[in-house]
UniProtKB/Swiss-Prot annotation:
The keyword Kinase does not apply. InterPro entries: Asn/Gln-tRNA_amidoTrfase_suB/E, Asn/Gln-tRNA_Trfase_suB/E_cat, Asn/Gln_amidotransferase, Asn/Gln_tRNA_amidoTrase-B-like, GatB, GatB_C_1, GatB_Yqey_C_2, Gln-tRNA_amidoTrfase_suB_CS. Belongs to the GatB/GatE family. GatB subfamily. It comes from the Bacteria. GO terms for biological process: glutaminyl-tRNAGln biosynthesis via transamidation; translation. Allows the formation of correctly charged Asn-tRNA(Asn) or Gln-tRNA(Gln) through the transamidation of misacylated Asp-tRNA(Asn) or Glu-tRNA(Gln) in organisms which lack either or both of asparaginyl-tRNA or glutaminyl-tRNA synthetases. The reaction takes place in the presence of glutamine and ATP through an activated phospho-Asp-tRNA(Asn) or phospho-Glu-tRNA(Gln). It is an enzyme of class 6 (ligase). This is Aspartyl/glutamyl-tRNA(Asn/Gln) amidotransferase subunit B. It catalyses: L-glutamyl-tRNA(Gln) + L-glutamine + ATP + H2O = L-glutaminyl-tRNA(Gln) + L-glutamate + ADP + phosphate + H(+); L-aspartyl-tRNA(Asn) + L-glutamine + ATP + H2O = L-asparaginyl-tRNA(Asn) + L-glutamate + ADP + phosphate + 2 H(+). One of its GO terms (molecular function) is asparaginyl-tRNA synthase (glutamine-hydrolyzing) activity. Its EC number is 6.3.5.-.
Amino acid sequence: MARYETVIGVEVHAQLKTKSKIFCSCSTRFGVDPNENVCPVCSGMPGVLPVLNATVVEYAAKMGLATGCVVNPVSVFARKNYFYPDLPKGYQTSQFEQPICEHGHVDITVDGTAKRIGITRIHMEEDAGKNIHSAADNLSYVDLNRACVPLIEIVSEPDMRGPEEVVAYLKALRAILVYLDVCDGNMEEGSFRCDANVSLRPVGQAEFGTRAELKNLNSFRHVQKAIEYEVERQADILDDGGKVIQETRLYDAAKNTTASMRGKEEAHDYRYFPDPDLVPVRIEAATLDKWRAELPELPEARRARFVADFGLSDYDAEVLTAERDMAEYFEAAVAAGADPKKAANWMQSELLRELNQAGVAARDAKLTPEKLASLVKLIDSGEISGKIAKQIFPDLFAQGLDPADYVRQKGLSQISDSNALESAVEAVLAANPAEVEAFRGGKTKLMGFFVGQIMKATKGQANPGLVNELLQKKLG
């Protein structure tokens, strides 16, 4: 029986998909030369004044609406004071006592069990710059391209009790952000970052234990591994009679360990106070109603609809709705006449593999949903076999070819003429007399062998159903 209960809360920083930064007109484009997207405002020069990007407010409010939050009609920016080389002003412009959104939730399912994870708050803030350390000349450089890029921080309640719940929560949160088109969810580029606050307490105890904050979690797998390690580390300390220190720890993926980075600060350490350069943000009720009406169908609702309308399994619906463009691709394929379950199977196997190998999103695939539907219908009609379809799929995907035209040009149509197949069946039986005798002696599993030989002889073009029928007659 477990001695301790794990308690986890998560802070997610999501970079918003605005064209310009939160308080200036500099571009937010990723991957440019260091300090290319910098101006006096985002570099913290004296005497400059920030101007709030209205789109940031809209995106933050829409995320709040999508997660059932109360969107406050008035919210206030505050200065979070601390020193770090990549923070040019000596403070971060964030929100503290009056955030834009509060009291929301996200529903997750782990191992068939549904659970609601509370969201404490969502607030707007600016990102910091980036330190670049050069071992060659023993210097550290500061790139301010990321400084002043708009973020929303989404703070959960400490409702999660294991790494599996955390990963499910993060995936659900990321899916909502992507569906809203307010964040691209790219963890590798830092558009979706998370910190996990992990603590243990004896089973049955109401009071929380001392927490450690885990950073450098840049993939869902790293989140899982880091929390597993941290839970074990804290349990060992408590078993030995020690006390867990409140601190920030950095996850090392290569070693699969966490190491102390610094003491964990409390809110009072940052000396928050309202930013005098920014007026309170006011959202009119009519504006909020407009934004609410613009919300798209969200992942949870679409998942339920896929199960109800298309007869998909919960698993298939979850996979297809995890990414908005995959869900839209699926619906377009079904609208073009593809059987829903068969389209789902082809998307999860062949299409997803090719997309991952090519590094492209479904919306950018040369093989359109209509062409995938055409392929599925060719199989259903008996024009080609599933085996042939799998063989030609890479070419169809890479070149965006029309399946019917490709099959006709290559002469790949399935052989469904019984007279044409009968000679192939007789040839295979004549070439394998021992197997024929064994089959007639009761080894009926050899049917698969005969079918395989005929498919080989016809280069996979024989109609499997007709082959079975002819074999039964010949061997009966």
